[in-house]
Amino acid sequence: SQKKYVFKYAGRNSRLDDIQAAVLDVKLKYLVEDNQHRKEVAHLYYEGIKNPIVTLPDLLPDEQNAYHLFPILVGEGKRDALHDYLEQKGVGTVIHYPIAPHKQECYAKEAWNVPQLSLPITERLADEELSLPIGPTITRDEINDVIRLINIFR
């Protein structure tokens, strides 16, 4: 696709060359440690983020989440504004699916015929989802900055 997150063709992405495999082999040695760090970051987000326009992911009992991502929902139509605000403050966030999958051009073809579907939950997620930084190298100071900036955002 020439434009990020805009898909003309249905398909999949499943590449893994030799170099990527070698890097992955090294990274796997740190998987348990990295997952534990991400769980600690997620816990700090759950404890610290108090902005009423932000909905945190459900925390289910006995769940085992690796927290590869930490997607929040930003209500009141302010997702893009919060994304831009955090970006200006040096905090990288990601909007993973700005267009609901069933509204992508690749599904507009007659064979698929899905753009007319009404999927309100999917559309809400596309409008409100924002993923916070949660990688294995994020520091406590950076986490505190993310929390502080989200809490003062209006």
What is each residue range found by the language model?
Residues 1-154:
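PLP-dependent aminotransferase class I/II
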